[in-house]
Swiss-Prot record:
Protein's name in the database: Na(+)/H(+) antiporter NhaA
Effect of K300H: Retains 52% of Na(+)/H(+) antiporter activity and 88% of Li(+)/H(+) antiporter activity. Increases Km for Na(+) and Li(+). Does not affect pH-sensitivity. Decreases thermal stability
Topological domains annotated Cytoplasmic: 1-11, 81-96, 131-154, 201-204, 237-253, 311-339, 381-388
PANTHER family for this protein: NA(+)_H(+) ANTIPORTER NHAA, SODIUM ION/PROTON ANTIPORTER NHAA-RELATED
Species of provenance: Escherichia coli (strain K12)
Effect of D133N: Loss of both Na(+)/H(+) and Li(+)/H(+) antiporter activities under all pH conditions examined. Abolishes ability to grow on high salt medium
Entry keywords, A to Z: Antiport, Cell inner membrane, Cell membrane, Ion transport, Membrane, Sodium, Sodium transport, Transmembrane, Transmembrane helix, Transport
Amino acid sequence: MKHLHRFFSSDASGGIILIIAAILAMIMANSGATSGWYHDFLETPVQLRVGSLEINKNMLLWINDALMAVFFLLVGLEVKRELMQGSLASLRQAAFPVIAAIGGMIVPALLYLAFNYADPITREGWAIPAATDIAFALGVLALLGSRVPLALKIFLMALAIIDDLGAIIIIALFYTNDLSMASLGVAAVAIAVLAVLNLCGARRTGVYILVGVVLWTAVLKSGVHATLAGVIVGFFIPLKEKHGRSPAKRLEHVLHPWVAYLILPLFAFANAGVSLQGVTLDGLTSILPLGIIAGLLIGKPLGISLFCWLALRLKLAHLPEGTTYQQIMVVGILCGIGFTMSIFIASLAFGSVDPELINWAKLGILVGSISSAVIGYSWLRVRLRPSV
């Protein structure tokens, strides 16, 4: 029991469990004995009905859209705290992850197009390497435990949130044909209610969560990625202390173990089970996976590092306190973990064209993401000293 308590007290424990869940999913998805059970579990229908409102999704979508909204709620709370009281409190510090994220989307897309521009079909996948899987990137960073400066973790969170918002906008503009304007209207009203609650000084977390559920439902029905609702709710929950209590900090404390030990491992288990059937290493010579690998492994760190360097040189932004430019460069490598978001964009880009293209895209995403994770982790492990 003492060893178990020591493990769960470790800052790295959540990352370790997430990686184990991902490996288990890969094994089960590619084993003849367990692949059927694994896919049946993910396809299990779960229906929620309240009056005339009905949400009928399989288990995978409930995990990705509902549980991950809770994860993004926690991320929103942590980033808001740092924006108001911590390492992103000044305008120039807050601008830093925004500029980094822009570079981290533009350069990978351009590198991909350098390989695929001549092919009108594969060219449609230009957004694949522009995405970052925030859950896995943070999971790899968590493996380093207390070595990681808090400001560096917050920088990665803020960068990845902006990256995800960019990916959501790209999907809505270029890969979605059926946005529901009525649902987006309901979402806008819900956001307005959250703003009014915050301005009026409402401090009951439950009220914000209730409006957040309405917002989440509206965003889900609109065709936009529903996890966005979690970030928005997190930004509106009050942070200021009154009588020694802060609603945002209290909720952050409550959510952290649930996210670290249940939601993220479950997300990893549900999404890391990529079937390698039909995927061969011969496909690595194709321009599609080569473009994705180049975008994730080279384009992400290059774009983030270059735009950060320009921002510092032009005095548009400041480094987060307690971090170095070299650490920012390595975070750029971790942002090359595109994984689930990249696979999702690939399915939208090629799903109606050729299933073989999706297999090639998966190969490129896996190679690029795993390489980014291993290189980023190894480099940070060498560069960061263990805390005493």
